[in-house]
């Protein structure tokens, strides 16, 4: 019952926004956990630099920075590399820190019916192996593992709706399934607000969580966008469920191989 009320409340909060800016376009991707079929465009960069905080009972984890680099090859292909620097404290123990697993990947948008039509992509990524020291600190997984996801987006009335489903093939780590849903709309020419539900299930291991978050993007200027998100678990807080998770960062859009700032 609490889950249904939370979902209904979040969707209603977005539905009550009063203005739509036709030039804006809601999407998944940072600051959200769910990805979408969008790509930067040929020879363009999308760089996301952020801080991700997750707090659960007895454990606080910070990804500072969380680096997400994306480069467009043609209009439908994106090369990606993601990696966080993790600071983690647990049960009063000393803070552990270091680089965690990297995530190189390639996104291909194989269906594109325009901004108002269906768009679909696949975005395979590799969770790379981490150093022995990082694994001993508990800030990285052994790796490698292989993520095979599918992303779908469609405009429904004033809302942009994104869905992602994926599966981690077991390499050195558990099999894991992810499901993500993002819906949102522009509020002004500068501000976009979205709601996300994200479900992450691993076989016989953590994580096993469903989270709800609200977030958005605010255009600061040409090629610069502020990113923000805050949420929590919908399953209670036992078993390592996040009592709070949040993201704050900036998106930098560059065109012509990075020579100029680009527009969204």
What are these regions (language model features)?
Residues 1-11:
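Bacterial N-terminal signal peptides that target proteins for export
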Residues 14-24:
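C-terminal segment of classical bacterial N-terminal signal peptides
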Residues 26-264:
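Transmembrane beta-barrel domains of Gram-negative outer membranes and organellar outer membranes
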Residues 5-6, 20, 49:
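N-terminal cationic leader/targeting segments used for protein routing and processing
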């Amino acid at each position: 019952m609490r889950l249904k009320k939370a979902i209904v409340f979040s969707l209603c909060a977005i539905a009550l926004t009063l203005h739509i800016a036709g030039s804006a376009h809601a999407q998944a991707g940072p600051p959200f956990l769910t990805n979408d079929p969008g790509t930067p465009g040929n020879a363009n960069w999308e760089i996301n630099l952020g801080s991700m905080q997750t707090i659960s009972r007895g454990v606080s984890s910070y990804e500072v920075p969380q680096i997400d680099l994306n480069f467009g090859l043609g209009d439908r292909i994106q090369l990606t590399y993601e990696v966080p620097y993790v600071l983690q404290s647990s049960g009063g123990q000393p803070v552990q820190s270091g680089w965690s697993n990297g995530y190189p990947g390639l996104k291909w948008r194989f269906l594109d019916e325009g901004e108002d039509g269906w768009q679909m992509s696949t975005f395979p990524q590799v969770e790379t192996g981490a150093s022995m020291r990082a694994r001993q600190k508990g800030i990285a997984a052994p790796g490698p593992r292989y993520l095979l996801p599918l992303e779908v987006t469609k405009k429904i009335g004033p809302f942009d709706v994104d869905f992602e489903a994926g599966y981690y093939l077991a390499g050195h780590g558990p099999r894991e399934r992810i499901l993500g849903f993002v819906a949102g709309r522009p509020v002004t020419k500068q501000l976009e607000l979205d709601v996300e539900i994200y479900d992450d299930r691993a076989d016989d291991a953590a994580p096993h969580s469903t989270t709800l978050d609200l977030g958005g993007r605010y255009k600061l200027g040409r090629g610069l966008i502020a990113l923000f998100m805050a949420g929590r678990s919908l399953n209670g807080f036992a078993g390592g469920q996040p009592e709070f998770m949040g993201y704050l960062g900036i998106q930098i859009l560059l065109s012509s191989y990075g020579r100029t700032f680009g527009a969204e």
